[in-house]
């Protein structure tokens, strides 16, 4: 499948991309959106979430640097997007890092239906109630079957799941693809992952 047609559509439509991002990646996310032809807005204030989300072509929710206001903003933006059939992408960064973060992300998922969820193996395990071992936002667990985690999470959430790792996985609950989306493991990483 080629990505040239969707990219051409984005460039022609120049959609507003509403990103509730973390402070670590906000600049990168904005620049990436600009590079593909979207128009990013990195609004954070809960008071304007419904208005901004209603104008967006897509909404991205990242929980990397959470606080109560960001979770309130994410719930409002996501619910508004759902009501208007605007796709929502959720990146539940570090979902297993603390009980508070896990509870807030579970609450978010009760109120917002994402089209896509991007996770690592530890985050997927946490969302599936399997514990998941994380060090900050990095997955420490190397499950023997990350494909099973991706497929189970896609079925549970009813959306596409992108699971990053040595091999990146895309699952929709019925189909599973393995690819290298972003990661480019070194030979040392490949050797380590087999141990």
Task: List each model region and its residues.
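Conserved phosphate/ATP/ADP-binding segment of small-molecule kinases
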Residues: 99-176
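Glycine-rich phosphate/adenosyl-contacting loop at the front of the ribokinase-like
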Residues: 1-42
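Active-site cofactor/substrate anionic-group-binding motifs, chiefly glycine-
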Residues: 37-80
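Single conserved hydrophobic/aromatic residue that forms the stacking wall/gate
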Residues: 182-195
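A short helix->loop->beta-strand "cap" motif at the edges of active sites that frequently abuts
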Residues: 80-87, 115, 159
């Amino acid at each position: 499948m080629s990505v040239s047609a969707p990219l051409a559509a984005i460039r022609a439509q120049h959609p507003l991309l509403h990103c509730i991002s973390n402070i670590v990646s906000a600049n990168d996310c904005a620049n990436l959106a600009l590079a593909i032809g979207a128009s990013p807005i990195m609004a954070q204030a809960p008071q304007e979430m419904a208005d901004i989300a209603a104008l967006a072509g897509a909404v991205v929710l990242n929980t990397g640097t959470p606080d109560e206001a960001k979770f309130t903003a994410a719930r409002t933006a996501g619910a508004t997007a759902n009501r208007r059939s605007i796709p929502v992408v959720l990146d539940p960064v570090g979902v297993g890092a603390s009980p508070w973060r896990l509870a807030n992300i579970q609450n978010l998922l009760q109120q917002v239906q994402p089209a896509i969820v991007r996770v690592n193996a530890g985050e997927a395990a946490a969302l599936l109630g399997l514990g998941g071992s994380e060090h900050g936002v990095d997955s420490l667990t190397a499950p023997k079957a990350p494909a099973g985690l991706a497929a189970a999470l896609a079925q549970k959430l009813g959306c596409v799941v992108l699971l990053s790792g040595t091999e990146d996985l895309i699952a929709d609950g019925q189909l599973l693809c393995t690819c290298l989306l972003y990661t480019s493991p070194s030979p040392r990483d490949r050797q380590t992952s087999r141990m």
